[in-house]
Amino acid sequence: MGKYNLILSEYLSFIYNSQSAVQIPIYYSSNSELENRCIEFHSKCLENSKNGLSLRKLFVEYNDVIENATLLSILSYSYDKYNAVERKLVKYAKGKPLEADLTVNELDYENNKITSELFPTAEEYTDSLMDPAILTSLSSNLNAVMFWLEKHENDVAEKLKVYKRRLDLFTIVASTINKYGVPRHNAKYRYEYDVMKDKPYYLVTWANSSIEMLMSVFSHDDYLIAKELIVLSYSNRSTLAKLVSSPMSILVALVDINGTFITNEELELEFSNKYVRAIVPDQTFDELNQMLDNMRKAGLVDIPKMIQDWLVDRSIEKFPLMAKIYSWSFHVGFRKQKMLDAALDQLKTEYTENVDDEMYREYTMLIRDEVVKMLEEPVKHDDHLLRDSELAGLLSMSSASNGESRQLKFGRKTIFSTKKNMHVMDDMANERYTPGIIPPVNVDKPIPLGRRDVPGRRTRIIFILPYEYFIAQHAVVEKMLIYAKHTREYAEFYSQSNQLLSYGDVTRFLSNNTMVLYTDVSQWDSSQHNTQPFRKGIIMGLDILANMTNDAKVLQTLNLYKQTQINLMDSYVQIPDGNVIKKIQYGAVASGEKQTKAANSIANLALIKTVLSRISNKHSFATKIIRVDGDDNYAVLQFNTEVTKQMIQDVSNDVRETYARMNAKVKALVSTVGIEIAKRYIAGGKIFFRAGINLLNNEKRGQSTQWDQAAILYSNYIVNRLRGFETDREFILTKIMQMTSVAITGSLRLFPSERVLTTNSTFKVFDSEDFIIEYGTTDDEVYIQRAFMSLSSQKSGIADEIAASSTFKNYVTRLSEQLLFSKNNIVSRGIALTEKAKLNSYAPISLEKRRAQISALLTMLQKPVTFKSSKITINDILRDIKPFFTVSDAHLPIQYQKFMPTLPDNVQYIIQCIGSRTYQIEDDGSKSAISRLISKYSVYKPSIEELYKVISLHENEIQLYLISLGIPKIDADTYVGSKIYSQDKYRILESYVYNLLSINYGCYQLFDFNSPDLEKLIRIPFKGKIPAVTFILHLYAKLEVINYAIKNGSWISLFCNYPKSEMIKLWKKMWNITSLRSPYTNANFFQD
């Protein structure tokens, strides 16, 4: 078996190293004789350990089990009490503990004072400013590090250096923690007042971040960066990350481009050997030096020196070190401020009347015109989505908080909950549901707030608006997004593009007569100056649209939307400050509306257009591209002459002066070669991504289980690794062991094996080999997958009770009746299931399901139930295919230049051989004709799973399905009778399989699966006309070839001789594939 089980066994010996500790391995096998031996072996182990006898003899006697069966889990007994961590820590606590400088941060509570100084009493205490919000503890993290250190103390050569670097850093952490004692966590992994009162308030979150950093140290540079960040982040909890990452916005403008990739007309990346010189005016260097000065003032030494040294050559070869610093800066942890400070931050800006009204007018008009442009087609044609906007809103209502807790009755059960979906049901049951009235958010009913914490920036507040706002905005925003989807300017929404496409767009026009202007407008989005012109622009647009239709329902939709904007122009928020709730008039735009992303993009586009129209009075240029992406916008400007330092200087100053005339506090920069925005940065013609996902601290607590969080941890590790920040894999695996272990009693714990955690079942957490998704096809793998499928979905009494109540049933019936024109069980059941699934965000239900899940799991990990599930998974399909393939060696030359320097070598190699892809493969069925037909007449959006089910029904059933959703009979008949229907069968199957194989996640999203170079390694003689079978054979072959190359750095070619007789069997099977949800797929989804 793999490395994981080996480490697991070593880890258990490390943790439970006393006389009383016992490890009992549990094996299973799909072979019934061997399975009986496994059972005997297990019971004898239990027997022996109860009588205090050694297990060694049994290991010899049952060697056949150990050799041939598969490890299922390890049961560990230990009567050891808790102080193990403290004892082990002393060995490493040989250094000088850190002393926090208590004057570094502006806000008193951001200084790392002793907790009782910040919070004199337990009543005042809150952990919300330092809560790691992750279901693992500091003691576990310390154990994981000490385990690694002990395991590697005898390393030699280069590995010894890594050991020494990490040991040195851990000494700092250990000594500091040891001075105060290891804070003990409670059952919910929180740190309470009596634990923290005599310790520095930020000790835990700092230690977690430091451990994450030190376990990511490999080179000497890593060591220097980590040491500096660990030491300084102990005191500076507010500005460190910002200080360290600020220079990047200028660094990208300093590197010459010598060959780059550009987007061609086919939207593919194509190499261009152009040379573009970085033209940098002196003022830019002055600004950079100012930044480096600020870093030194904050006590940084090595990091500014590295940047200074790099500035000598400004080479792209050494640039990855700059990228590394930029990524590392985020790993100091989240900045979590008090809500009051977060809210006041936006209101502190001086409001001046001294602004350029003319520019504001232009800005407002551009917003107005864009809103009209986005919506005029659907409004003129009385689009059904705008007519049935309320129903569409209800169908996609979230189960997030509605801002207040209410007592709700479901049948005999009384519950109190804050969830939007439950409030809607309750209001309908009690005749309180009035979507036609948008509740005010003024001083009488101020808006409750949520928060968004992010490293290196201030905490931002989020409006938690009543559900009426969501219903009023949903349909209109969906229409805006559809427009944005085919408008290149909206980089974030543009049709199935990914970031590589946007990269090629920027480099496309760079030359010696162009410059690129890039602006971070996040300050502007939340400024008071923005709110009036912004909302007024939208309102004016809606007024114009209202004159384009006579349909009462469309008018009502537009009117309600307008009302949300009017209400929000007079908004108050409520902020708890100690025991009082403060009401503050809040005159700025905050996220929390459905329109946040779309409307911000519109506004930011309007903003950059306004600025460009102003500076075009002074300079003559052609605007080659304008893009907006979230909080950032950028534009490439082409001049008639070659760009000079003076020109850049002038344009730069004019742009800044122009923003200043609108009193917009934004950071605007001009360069000839690169840009830096929140999502990505381009330097030297190459693309970089910030690898800044925190592993051991989380932004907030949700209702995910420890297993979910272990999968998320692994997923975060993978994303960071693809972006150039690598954490030691053994450490990550150790964390997974800790987080997936299940306590049976105080002294008894069960640790699942690698097989359990990596087989794609409902319990999958990680991949045995990074970047490679394996679908087990051996007997034992399929056996365990089947066993897990037997206990997949857990019931919840509370959920069943709610679902049985009339309140719930009537709600579902009401939705079905409004949606359907005739009976349609598939849709009705689908709605009921979706609504029931939304109940999972109600804590008591998720807790109940979790308990059931764990008890089922416990049974399973001790002895797998023999259960012959008749369900077919993707594994079964691949298992049928596998035997017909023969492998031979092959060779592919490297033929593409590198353009993403931070990628791991094995992934980079594949892109260099077969090329990259700039699009997302469609995996939701939305491009199929049936999906388009439905959306033409109905607001209902079937999932890919549902489409997959429907498209394989009999033709008359498909007709009935369509007619019940309001599709005219003639259209339904035409559809079923046409070629399009058979194309759809294939297309939907294709989407479904892509979806099951996670083709848009991990590193697979980077590879060009249609590469001719890849195709030529695969030979499948064409037999019979079953395109679906040909498709799955090709896809399987491609994945096999790519996985082999990732693992071995060399290529194979595959030949498949698939018998005709088997094809039809396989085709039939392909219509019954069950999809599996697991913590792993859930974590992929969580990455977006």
UniProtKB/Swiss-Prot annotation:
Enzyme Commission code: 2.7.7.48
Keywords tagged on the record: Magnesium, Nucleotide-binding, Nucleotidyltransferase, RNA-binding, RNA-directed RNA polymerase, Transferase, Viral RNA replication, Virion
Which co-factor is required?
Answer: Mg(2+)
Q: Just give the chief location class.
A: virion
Instruction: Tell me where on the tree of life, at the top rank, the source sits.
Output: Viruses
Give GO cellular component annotations, separated by semicolons: virion component
Where do the RdRp catalytic domain residues begin and end?
501-687
Task: Write down the chemical reaction(s) this protein catalyses.
Answer: RNA(n) + a ribonucleoside 5'-triphosphate = RNA(n+1) + diphosphate
Q: Pfam families from the entry?
A: RdRP_4, Rotavirus_VP1
User: Which molecular function GO terms apply here?
Assistant: nucleotide binding; RNA binding; RNA-directed RNA polymerase activity
Record localization: Virion
Q: Broadest EC class?
A: transferase
Disulfide bridge partners, by residue number: none
GO process terms (BP): DNA-templated transcription; viral genome replication
Quaternary structure, per UniProt, is: Interacts with VP3 (Potential). Interacts with VP2; this interaction activates VP1. Interacts with NSP5; this interaction is probably necessary for the formation of functional virus factories. Interacts with NSP2; this interaction is weak.
Please give the family membership noted in the entry.
Belongs to the reoviridae RNA-directed RNA polymerase family.
| Biological function | RNA-directed RNA polymerase that is involved in both transcription and genome replication. Together with VP3 capping enzyme, forms an enzyme complex positioned near the channels situated at each of the five-fold vertices of the core. Following infection, the outermost layer of the virus is lost, leaving a double-layered particle (DLP) made up of the core and VP6 shell. VP1 then catalyzes the transcription of fully conservative plus-strand genomic RNAs that are extruded through the DLP's channels into the cytoplasm where they function as mRNAs for translation of viral proteins.
Q: Which protein are we looking at?
A: RNA-directed RNA polymerase
UniProt organism field: Rotavirus A (isolate RVA/Monkey/South Africa/SA11-H96/1958/G3P5B[2]) (RV-A)
